[in-house]
Amino acid sequence: MLYIFRLIVTVIYSILVCVFGSIYCLFSPRNPKHVATFGHMFGRLAPLFGLKVECRKPADAENYGNAIYIANHQNNYDMVTAANIVQPPTVTVGKKSLLWIPFFGQLYWLTGNLLIDRNNRAKAHSTIAAVVNHFKKRRISIWMFPEGTRSRGRGLLPFKTGAFHAAIAAGVPIIPVCVSNTSNKVNLNRLNNGLVIVEMLPPVDVSEYGKDQVRELAAHCRALMEQKIAELDKEVAEREATGKV
């Protein structure tokens, strides 16, 4: 019964946000500030799923300039966990096929997110150039999932290099965002599904990395994130075991 209730409320809420959000965005289409606004709105679904989301970020995070945010990509619950920490004006890079999801796809495009064709390598490379161009023209940040796909309980997957190519070419820092494990954590028939911690790490300076050191930069960032995620998972387990959620 709880499962059905959650499903109905989620569908109704999501459709309302997407429909009225799309209408709202028509007054200033493709404005990158919209992404954080509606990301946080989807983040409000976390309590409905029985999740307590705890966000941590550096004190001066709101003053960061242009940057590329990278986060671990686990499952669809990223929409209600990681979305809570998105800073304006940040846009995401997603698959072109997202555009065809009813209601959501239209909002995704109108909020200013970038769409890439993963099946066309040439177009994917041109997207990196477009990202760099965006940085040169305006104050904007980009959010990317360097794993390229949902990990679904397989741990932190190997990183693709697109985000790191773009960061070096644009001369902007990389800001890792780490989310504690959510794989097999949510049971929609269970009232309380525990704690999820989302932590933003300090910026990684890319100025010391050349174009031929992209993989080194990717490996460095992945190591930072892997260590932090392990720490967060340990903390979550300890707090849930002692009831200090």
From Swiss-Prot:
Q: How does it sit in the membrane?
A: Peripheral membrane protein
Motif HXXXXD motif, chain ranges: 73-78
The EC code for this enzyme is 2.3.1.51
Alphabetical keyword list: Acyltransferase, Cell inner membrane, Cell membrane, Lipid biosynthesis, Lipid metabolism, Membrane, Phospholipid biosynthesis, Phospholipid metabolism, Transferase
Q: What class of enzyme is it?
A: transferase
Q: What is its main location?
A: membrane
Instruction: Please provide the record's free-text comment about the domains of this protein.
Output: The HXXXXD motif is essential for acyltransferase activity and may constitute the binding site for the phosphate moiety of the glycerol-3-phosphate.
Q: What is this protein called?
A: 1-acyl-sn-glycerol-3-phosphate acyltransferase
What gene does the UniProt entry assign to this protein? Answer: plsC
